[in-house]
Amino acid sequence: MLFRSLLGLLSALAPVITGGNTCVALAARDYPLCAVSLAETLHTADLPAGVVNLLTGFRAELLEPFATHMDVNALIYFGDDHAEIAQAESSAAENVKRVTVCGRAEWEGAAALNPYAILRTQETKTTWHPFRF
């Protein structure tokens, strides 16, 4: 089960940082050692400081600060607790934060390999360029 915790964390982090964003992630309560080991690995790697920030703690205590913090622009919730999902969505509505609920994922499946997961934290903007004939 340890590899699934690490695989799940990497599968959640990779689309966010691939899109050029920073990430604040909450480690799984059951297996926090995977996240702490990954944080130490990222610290010694060439990833700039502050790109990935891993926290340990209780999700019930940290969900509200995640959802209401004004510098957090998107929230991706991995889980199936309907009360926590409702709390995250209502708290995030204060600053029009994008909330994506992913549920429990099977990290070895084809759905976890979808490259469009990058779009969950991206803003698409259109720029018009004038053109003369």
Report each predicted region and the residues it spans.
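Hydrophobic/aromatic ligand-binding patch that stacks against planar heteroaromatic rings
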Residues: 14-17, 65, 91
